[in-house]
């Protein structure tokens, strides 16, 4: 097992990364305010992992309640969130009752948001079971739900007490979901660490084959970069926005196609290609850099061509982006591979050219 710390002063918390951590109640117990939890999971992950987590906690004397939600991005909304509140109220959950998110990014985001809201804030723990949630969404305290007009538009910054990333759960992950997670891993190389990017190019086959050593390294390095960025800028006042490479375009793809049609990682992958092409048109990246980005995204089994929503639709959806400031869209682009920049100075003709097929 490897451990990282997200350094946020008295709200710091550990990220434990390893195999067979799901049954390690000894890792969970120190972070419980009372021996009482509510596990939030979904209809896919619950049948696979809920029983063993519950048994381990109950054997340690913890009272465990559960709520099982429908699976999918299409359910990341108020109606589903209310099912969590219904369960908490039925169980008479208290302010010291800990919520445990057992699932991927949707479950983690909704559980964290429920924890931030219920009785104005109860503790929660992240047990991410997808690669995307293990390397990205479980770390850093972004929680929330979608709105028909925009992804993740309703939410809160609310940090977990613990992140438990059990790489063994990736064994049941469909190949498409694994690839979606690799998009966020690639993102860290593009924005922060060109050596990690080169390592990903050399090891993509191992990662897709779930080679234990390769997967552990990818999770650790991704979390290490994210923890460093979040520690410097928890609430996305500046630096943290670089973690959104590909997300301005990607969120527009998800909204425009209908939540769940494209997985988040797939939309981000295509969005990162659009960001690379924009960076090239601004004179920052060379043609070879864009080709290298595309090739790695394809090697991960991800789309490198964005859907044709039409320029106007893209601009409409991107106008709802959370990085918009003073009515101006702000983009995360690449000064070079391994170095991101945030800018609002993207000329309209450049955007139009990038968003007009063929890409």
Swiss-Prot record:
Q: Which GO terms describe its biological process?
A: amino acid biosynthetic process; aromatic amino acid family biosynthetic process; chorismate biosynthetic process
What does this protein need as cofactor? Co(2+); Zn(2+); NAD(+)
UniProtKB keywords: Amino-acid biosynthesis, Aromatic amino acid biosynthesis, Cobalt, Cytoplasm, Lyase, Metal-binding, NAD, Nucleotide-binding, Zinc
Free-text remark on how the cofactor is bound: Binds 1 divalent metal cation per subunit. Can use either Co(2+) or Zn(2+).
List the pathway annotation: Metabolic intermediate biosynthesis; chorismate biosynthesis; chorismate from D-erythrose 4-phosphate and phosphoenolpyruvate: step 2/7
Q: Which reaction does it catalyse?
A: 7-phospho-2-dehydro-3-deoxy-D-arabino-heptonate = 3-dehydroquinate + phosphate
Q: What is this protein called?
A: 3-dehydroquinate synthase
Annotated source species: Thiobacillus denitrificans (strain ATCC 25259 / T1)
Q: Which gene encodes it?
A: aroB
């Amino acid at each position: 097992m490897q451990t990282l710390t997200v350094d946020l002063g008295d709200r710091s918390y550990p990220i434990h990364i390893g195999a067979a951590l799901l049954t390690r109640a000894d890792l969970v117990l120190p972070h419980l305010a009372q021996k009482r939890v509510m596990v939030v999971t979904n209809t896919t992950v619950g049948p696979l992992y809920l029983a063993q987590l519950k048994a381990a906690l109950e054997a340690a004397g913890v009272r465990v309640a559960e709520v099982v939600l429908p699976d999918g991005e299409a359910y990341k909304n108020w109606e589903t969130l209310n099912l969590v509140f219904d369960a908490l109220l039925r169980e008479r959950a208290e302010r010291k009752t800990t919520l445990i998110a057992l699932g991927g990014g949707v479950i983690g985001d909704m559980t964290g948001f429920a924890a931030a809201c219920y009785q104005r804030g109860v503790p929660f723990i992240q047990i991410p079971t997808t690669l995307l949630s293990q390397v990205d969404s479980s770390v850093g305290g972004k929680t929330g739900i979608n709105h028909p007009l925009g992804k993740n538009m309703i939410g809160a910054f609310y940090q977990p007490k613990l992140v438990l990333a059990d790489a063994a759960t990736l064994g049941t992950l469909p190949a498409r979901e694994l690839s979606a997670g690799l998009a966020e891993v690639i993102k860290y190389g593009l924005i922060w660490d060109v050596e990690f990017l080169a390592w990903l190019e050399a090891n993509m086959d191992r990662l897709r084959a779930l080679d234990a050593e390769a997967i552990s390294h990818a999770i650790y390095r991704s979390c290490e970069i994210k923890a460093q960025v979040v520690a410097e800028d928890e609430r996305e006042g500046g630096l943290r926005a670089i973690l959104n490479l590909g997300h301005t375009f990607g969120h527009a793809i998800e909204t425009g196609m209908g939540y769940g049609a494209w997985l988040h990682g797939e939309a981000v992958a295509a969005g990162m290609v659009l960001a690379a092409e924009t960076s090239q048109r601004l004179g920052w990246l060379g043609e070879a850099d864009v080709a290298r980005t595309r090739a790695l995204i394809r090697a991960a089994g991800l789309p490198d061509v964005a859907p044709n929503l039409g320029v106007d639709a893209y601009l409409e959806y991107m106008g709802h982006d959370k990085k918009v400031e003073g009515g101006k869209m702000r983009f995360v682009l690449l000064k070079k591979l391994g170095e991101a920049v945030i800018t609002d100075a993207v000329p309209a003709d450049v955007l139009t050219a990038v968003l007009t097929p063929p890409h």
